[in-house]
Regions:
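Extracytoplasmic/periplasmic ligand-capture domains
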Residues: 1-102, 106-107, 115-255
């Protein structure tokens, strides 16, 4: 039995620093993978051990195209499954794993984990292998064949396919990953810009249909079973970043 627990209240931005100086005995929340190197360096000095624990989410981070984007031309593009598959096959997950996660991550899609009884290996691997040739072909098949002088594909309205990927601004890890994605998406004629903000602004922009793509953690329950709620996989709530307006419509009975 433990005689006493003492919970210290601190700004979440200070948690990793306080942990690294040995001020806490046990800490998990508010420690991110981008704190890993800093924490490992402090082990001998502050007499603690840094442990890596697997997450129960479908993916540590995932990209969410907003199928309810207000721009009707862009909305039509985002809703085309060929476009989303093209984006996925132009993400070099191996590079991200090596550069950001020191090769310690598992590469693949945002889906249930191998420990889930519903898991199938192709859920994680389908459209998740780097294949720029296949990506370019899918985009060509969509009719996005015209390009500007920079090589950026043009949308049907003549505007370049410049996409803003929005983040909650809480971690440099997300912007570092987007920098790596940026280089490969340029090779398929798509230019992206990362836009950090604050969490409430980030979510409100998504809910309002102002966001094209956002980056956030994957499905909450990566260990789903036949008895689990399937709500995360259908537009049942505004909180789901890929279809917030459909979710809102469901929650309000269309009102």
């Amino acid at each position: 039995y433990v005689d006493e627990f003492i919970f210290g209240i601190a700004n979440n931005k200070l948690i990793s620093a306080k942990t690294g100086t040995g001020e806490v005995d046990l800490q998990a929340r508010y420690l991110r993978f981008d704190d890993y190197t800093f924490l490992k360096k402090g082990e001998d000095r502050s007499a603690y051990s840094t442990r890596l624990w697997p997450t129960a989410k479908g993916s540590h981070l995932a990209l969410f195209p907003n199928l309810n984007n207000n721009n009707k031309v862009l909305q039509s593009i985002l809703r085309d499954v060929r476009f989303r598959r093209a984006l996925s096959m132009a993400v070099d997950r191996y590079e991200i794993n090596q550069v950001i996660y020191y090769g310690l991550a598992i590469e693949g899609n945002n889906t249930v984990l191998p420990e889930s009884p519903l898991y199938k290996s192709y859920y994680r691997s389908r459209w998740a292998q780097l294949d720029l040739k296949a990506s370019n072909k899918l985009l060509d098949d969509m009719g996005l064949t015209e390009r500007d002088s920079r090589g950026i594909r043009l949308m049907p309205d003549g505007n370049p396919l410049n996409l803003i990927v929005e983040t909650a601004g809480e971690s440099t890890e997300q912007t570092d990953i987007l920098e790596l994605i940026h280089d490969n998406w340029l090779k398929i004629g798509i230019k992206i810009y990362s836009k950090p903000s604050q969490r409430n602004v980030f979510r409100n922009r998504i809910f309002a249909g102002e966001t094209a793509i956002s980056i956030w953690s994957g499905i909450e329950n990566g260990l789903a079973s036949a008895n689990s709620s399937p709500a995360e996989f259908a537009p049942t709530t505004q909180q789901l970043l890929q279809w917030p307006k459909w979710g809102q419509n469901f929650e309000t009975d269309g009102k």
